[in-house]
Amino acid sequence: MLMFRSILFFTVFISFLNSFGQVYDGTYKIKKQNPKAAGCAPPTTTTYLELNNVRAMVHTAGNLWQVPNQNYSQYEVPKNSGINALFTAALWLGGTDANNQLKLAALRYRNGQDYWTGPLSKVQAETNYENCNKYDKHFITTQDAIREFNAWYEAGVNDQQNGTNTQSELFPDYRVPDIVKTWPAHGDVSQGQDYYLAPFYDYNGDGNYNWQDGDFPWHDIKKTKECSVDRSVSLYGDINFWWVMNDRGNIHSETGADPIGMEIRAQAFAFASNDEINNMTFYNYELINRGTQTLYNTYFGFFTDGALGDPYDDYVGCDVNRGLGYYYNGDNYDGDNSGFKGYGYAPPAVGVDFFEGPYQDNDGIDNAFGIGHDEALNGIGYGDGIIDNERFGMRRFLYYSNTTNGANPNQTDPVNASDYYNYLRGFWKDGTKFVYGGSGYISDPDANPLVPCDFMFPGNTDPLGWGTNGVPQSNWTEQTANNTPNDRRFVQSAGPFVLKPGAVNNITVGVVWARSQNGDPFESVEALRTANDKAQALFENCFKVLDAPHAPELQIQELNNELILTLSNPVNSNNYNEGYEEYDPFIATADPNADKTYNFQGYQIFQLKDTKVSVSELSDPTKARLVVQCDIKDDVSKIINFEFSDELNASIPVQRVNGENKGIRHSFSVKTDLFAQGNMQLVNFKRYYYLAIAYAYNNYKNYTPDDPTAIDGQKKSYLASRKAAIGEVKPMEGIPHFPQPESGGTVFNLSYGSSPQITRIDGYGNGNRSLEFDDATLNSILANGYMENPTYDYGKGPINIKVVDPLNLA
């Protein structure tokens, strides 16, 4: 996790230089690098991905999360906690040509550089300084902005067809975002680049990007893409960073290897959510081989350096079936260390799910799933009836340790190209195979030198012995091996395969974080597996998520020992005028007439313990407590979701709403601190935090777990806001205080909920309300028998009017 310092930097760099001249290493060759290169400078752009409960630093230079040139990282989760879970990550790619010459690109801490920005030419995989510099940026889009642009454009099309003014009425001040206008949809064909570069939706199908024709960066806002059969790459996530890299911009000073000629179109993306997905980020790499040579024994890997709070007390492990590699703490307390802030008691686990890797070599059949000949361990496309669409999953999982911490030098950081390639293939730096047990090294007395393995520390997730030549082994984790916790790194690798010129592959990974409140650190790994299953389901659904009703805008008026909370929905909200409805394509039922639409049902407002509480933690009473709930007055009150329990291995009922069923309200008086002990009255000048969400309801069929005719019923009738109309759901702060100083000393005599006296000037009827005249009107009627303009008592008039904001009365 930590970068090499002082003289160690110099030593490692010298070993890099020496490796340039190495002729043979094992079964392949490394030749001296050709000094001719494009002369590109190292990329410098850095952007924070921080839509949800994670703050992640993303670079255009090829690695992730590490603060450039510092022994510090920025993969902070929970966001605003000051605690980081990971240090850095990068792609490792390597293979040999027909002459056994190794070609490889990799990165760790950018002590050297193997990746640069910009596309390559299609023929000779060429680039230049100007091209690299031009693309040293993240092209950032949000699904909200793209959806709004599409709605604006289609409103204009509708106006032209029908002579209406919908566009100007619904979007009076709309401006097309610059990213839509300047989207890098096309490469420079004069330099031999691919005409089609960044993915875009071609509205009129003319093959050219023009936003004035309705084209836009291709977020699948209509949710029509079928990723199981469509190989094209769209943009994913509520927010997306897109950029393009290559490994031909200059000499490989990280590994010393010859370049491959790889063009890499990268994405980093995230979703705002109200569940475990709120603690995740995702990364997709489309890899196009622009090189002219076929590479054999090719491996693609994803390297991750963990820093789970204190980086010096971590363990690693993997879940073979899930394709998941993870870090967890070596004991039940994660303290502060060397400037790194720890998680404390019951520390979390963090993992990387290797969703998809490169395509398996074509063999003319649809490979199945299992351990037989040509069958897969994990991955996608196996046994789906489609020939030659199989993609590797995690085929190897390996770890190594920080060079500076006294570890076996053969199990430490790579220092030359052969080390990187050995790790990708499943060998230690000295060329010995990984073996099962102990530390995985052949001389370890607790390791079995007769059992080579592909997956280090799989626990009990490899019951068929996929990683041990079909011979099942006993449970093996770092805990069971009693290893010394250390500063770990791991690599998830896929291969071998043949990489041909022009071949297009994808690597997609998801970073998952979870925390158990139990003391044993491995309990957080179990929680991580549950969270990872949601990440896997999201990937398998093409990263399509239900939007859910947007959270309302929450405003707070501060009064003496009182806060007034008001809710509203802006015009760009999918719940404007409380009109949210959304079709759920994932509802599976044999009933063709089943109602598959969620509709707006109500609001919930929570008091939060502090600003660190995210929307995914609202069910934790130590962090969030329900202040108020209101819902449509109908036959729906209590709403139950059936949620899977790993402990019980069954779906259990969880009450999400106990509805008051009295109708929708938009303003609320709060005088009570739900986290206070003793006197619960709000205290002036104290900070309080609130968060509001909307929720929708669908119950196409009652779910009954013990009724075989009802097990296809609705398990999740309650669907809560996962985001706002723009961006994440954010808490609001309120500080009660005397309001007079902010209004020039004016005293306010009306309070929240008060109704004014109403005088009838004209009209008739009671508005379906109980009416009462004031005393003056009654006395006039008794004296004169008639009152031309009667005045009604407070709150007893024919019109229902109440004071919502006492400070906003004229």
Label every PLM stretch briefly.
Residues 1-25, 733-736:
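Bacterial Sec-dependent N-terminal signal peptides
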Residues 22-810:
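Extracellular/surface-associated beta-sandwich interaction domains
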